[in-house]
């Protein structure tokens, strides 16, 4: 409420016996309260919880480890899974350069390390965690451009430079191939990468959608798993549900869902576990311009609007003697993209990346001793063509070539190697720190086994030998629950690095790069190798006396 002052002007008339009229002016002032027209923003009644950065409660040590994987190889068909004749057994998996490779790196528990110098931390008051400081994703195989396509691709003709008008027919599909959009990307985090795609949505209950109408679509967030297809130029869409003609895209995605990382969601995550940092490089251009075949679902606005009251303002109808009058083409235009030049000058892989400050509150701390590395790289997208003589005769004795006697096979290979620089960090077991971690994920405290363990009432327990026999009592109906993996229903490329850690950083390529890049030197203190700043041995330069 705001006060409002109102002034009232009242004229008064008075006369005497001599009929002289006097005019008196009265000005009255009064104040009233009126509702405020603007909005008033009040502070919240309770304080808002503040999420702390890991740098505020994680203490970093000067102990670094180098972790590395084996050479990771995979071989398969670039377009689809190959099953046996009965279709009951998968014989050859789908391995494409346009797939996401999601590595789940398992790290050892640092709290179970037998450290030579036990003064590094106090197990009664602290817990150890890993901090990621550097990573290098190695890629083998030469650079190459792969092609995708469909033997029955839905295209009527070229719409960029047509030489004759071509309408639609019953079946206009052609055998078309093209190279996909060029994509290099990797995302590092201690939780799986969050992806997004467009999918078929449920219509409202009161809506009566006729058969053949376009369904509503919605944006879906889901975890990017190993083997999920990336965007190759046709968008992040559930093609299996939204393209029922099975001919609008290439074979490798016609029955798949293409996902794209939801960078907006991960950047605004309050904890930032899904993405510490990422690197991305995409490029494409439109190479060919085609038009779809089939009946157009959304006609060009013309006389069908308002019972013919609206004129056609998009084109002038052709003459009835022209082909365009009886067989008008549709307006479903689309391009086929191309990734263009593949060069070693623009490679994100086979080079180190150092993490100084993450984009979120988690500055590289690997909760649950694991790290997720999501990779896409189709710059090494060569597909091998393997031909086999089917009749078994000696190839040197074949006189006339007959293509029916040779079977052609396609194979694609992937080669990876991952190296890490891990920093040993410690977290004090203080009340405010534990409250912060418990609000973030209470399973972390269970992993640290911080619960109170009461003393046993009776040190002697009964143990039956044949507990499942009919002669003994029934076993316990409520056995102790095993630890449940939150990602057990998701598919990742699991890489165990529990026994692949080393303190000898100077013995590995990434370790030497880290020492030289940071200007550090390695020393051994009480049997534990530590890292310290490099001190220059050069003396002070003296001025020359005149």
Swiss-Prot record:
Compartments it resides in: Virion; Host nucleus
One GO CC term, this protein: host cell nucleus
Gene3D superfamilies (alphabetical): Major capsid L1 (late) superfamily, Papillomavirus
Keyword Metal-binding: no
Highest taxon listed in the record's lineage: Viruses
Keyword annotations: Capsid protein, Disulfide bond, Host nucleus, Host-virus interaction, Late protein, T=7 icosahedral capsid protein, Viral attachment to host cell, Viral penetration into host cytoplasm, Virion, Virus endocytosis by host, Virus entry into host cell
An annotated Gene Ontology molecular function: structural molecule activity
GO biological process, one term: virion attachment to host cell
Pfam families cross-referenced by the UniProt entry: Late_protein_L1 (PF00500)
Membership in a protein family: Belongs to the papillomaviridae L1 protein family.
Protein's job: Forms an icosahedral capsid with a T=7 symmetry and a 50 nm diameter. The capsid is composed of 72 pentamers linked to each other by disulfide bonds and associated with L2 proteins. Binds to heparan sulfate proteoglycans on cell surface of basal layer keratinocytes to provide initial virion attachment. This binding mediates a conformational change in the virus capsid that facilitates efficient infection. The virion enters the host cell via endocytosis. During virus trafficking, L1 protein dissociates from the viral DNA and the genomic DNA is released to the host nucleus.
Subunit structure and binding partners: Self-assembles into homopentamers. The capsid has an icosahedral symmetry and consists of 72 capsomers, with each capsomer being a pentamer of L1. Interacts with the minor capsid protein L2; this interaction is necessary for viral genome encapsidation. Interacts with protein E2; this interaction enhances E2-dependent replication and transcription activation.
Protein name: Major capsid protein L1
UniProt organism field: Human papillomavirus 19
UniProt gene name: L1
